[in-house]
Amino acid sequence: MINDAASRREFLRAMAVGGAGLALSSRLSAAKTKSVLLFTKSSGFEHAVIKTTPGNPSVVEKTLRGLAKQRGFEVNATKDGRIFDSPEFHSYAAVFFFTTGDLTTEGTDKNPPMTVAGKQALLDAVKGGLGFVGAHAASDTFHTPPDPQDNSNRYIAHGEQSDPYLRMLGGEFITHGRQPRLQTADVIVDDPKFPGLEGVTSPVKFNEEWYSMKDFMTDIHVILTVDTKTMTGEPYQRPPYPVTWARMHGKGRVFYTAMGDLAENWEIPFFVNVVGGGVRWAIGDVSAKLTQNIKEAAPGYAVIPPKFPPETK
């Protein structure tokens, strides 16, 4: 019990200061919670892993929310391209794309498209420091025009003339296998120190719809390559090439993995850790040493595979 007035005043002053400190600490803690915008509009083919039904989030969203709960960030999901024109867009620490096609068109899923200004706002934001994570079909997005139905333009190296989105991302999807569409291949771990890959033994056998890609930015830091030696089909008649990488786009941290087609892969620890490490790096929660290693990790990266032969009827 506090008896004298002076002691009571000192006690109350200490309580007030302590209370203010706790309130400030609480506000700072809340302010430190970073948010990731999951954007899954499909102007082209709509993948099963991003399909939603009323009250049921997509496979990708479920995995990302699980990672968010473990790692202390938040996730908001949308298929509405108008988000990039809104003030809300600028509140995110990173965006996560699993998308297809020209997102400035309504396209397959009929959700509101991005505007041309919204696309530019995205690119400007990443250059200014927004994190960007792309999975699988994020490289099947904003193909360098024209993009005819026979995909012939995808077999041409456009280099600096590639679409600005693809330059930001670091590479472009050409095609994937047909028969078989899925193959188990050896994934070579080029950077076992990148977040999420600690303790992983290389190579890793992984079943996937493997994207064959081109127009790699030469400044990418290759994290994973796929070994094509045992793979079958025209898309893989090429040397090993990058399937997961990181790069800086101005001040923005960009991470991409070509994997993620199969629903079951979004539950496999190896892949979940790859995605989680990429997100945590993109939002700045962990660091990584980036080296421009594409010429060492994949010396034949620039080889473009042969086109599929015409289908006979």
Locations of the language-model features?
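Helical hinge/lid and interdomain linker segments adjacent to catalytic or ligand-binding clefts
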Residues: D4-A6, L38, E46-F142
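Catalytic beta-strand/loop cores that center a nucleophilic Ser/Cys/Thr
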Residues: L28, R167, G171-G250
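Short, solvent-exposed loop/turn segments at secondary-structure junctions
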Residues: S43-G44, R82-I83, G101-L103, S139-T141, ...
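Extracellular ligand-binding/catalytic regions of CAZymes and related secreted enzymes
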Residues: T40, V60, G66-Q70, T230-K313
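C-terminal segment of N-terminal export signals and the immediately downstream linker at the start
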Residues: A5, S26-F45
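A glycine-rich, often tryptophan-bearing local segment used as a flexible ligand/cofactor-contacting loop or short
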Residues: D102-E198
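N-terminal secretory signal peptides and thylakoid transit peptides that target proteins
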Residues: I2-G19
